[in-house]
Amino acid sequence: RGSSQMKKLPGLSKTLFPIVFGCDNQSDANHAFAMFDHYTSLGGNVFDTAYIYNDGMSDQYLGRWINARNNREEIVVLGKGAHSPDCFPSAIRPQLEETLNRLQSNYLDIYCLHRDNLDVPVSEFIDSLNDLREEGLIKVFGASNWSLDRFKEANEYAHSTNQQPFTLISNNFSLARMIEPVWPGCISCSEEDFKSYLEANQIAIFPWSSQARGFFLDQQE
């Protein structure tokens, strides 16, 4: 892969391929291994998984492949947890530890809260994530499907307490506007005020469904 393609994320020493492999929906280990091998043969090195994906098999397939290829230090793993209805600070650690066990790894490069819970103060999420970072279980962290107001509030709290803030967001981001959430609790960051904030603060976007689930395809395609 050409070095000009690779991206940097503050807090990570590894460089990142600009196209991330989403690990959900792998039918079996053989299919997953073939897909992972093909992706890495093209220069890819970033894998997106989550505690709830495929009832945990997403983590397990990726972990088996990493173990077989002995390439943990060559790839970047983005894991997500605390999805509704378990979106509480108390759920983060046990789910993360189970994910790490499935992955046969002792850390995640990137961790994202999979959803937000408006009944929980942002301070509690930030404090919990910083504890895990200080223990070395995660390198950097961010949020998935968070509103602009809550994301800003969380980072303002982190800065005010000299803690690590969110360094990335994983919301929907596409040229197509999401009229209705694809899944409950999904949020876009394609709006102008959201984009302006992310650009001004140099927050990385790890978007999902940028191609709007085939919206831009010609019918014949």
What is the meaning of each model-derived region?
Residues 22-30, 81-90, 114-119:
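Active-site mouth loops of central-metabolism enzymes
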